[in-house]
Amino acid sequence: MEHRKLIKANEVLRRCAISRATLYRLISKKCFPNQVSVTGSRSVAWREDEVQKWINERPYSK
């Protein structure tokens, strides 16, 4: 079984340099990687590789 590293919302916000509101706006528009439920807790996380891919492919605005 392949294990991927998961990162929590605060780390996603830091790496992407976006606000929590922007994160959830992107999620609602289906413009951000899917979140996954963390087994044994009520929290969610994101797959690190998918977030990094999104960052790498994100167009930069000036």
PLM ranges: what are they?
Residues 16-44:
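Major-groove DNA-recognition helix of helix-turn-helix-type DNA-binding domains
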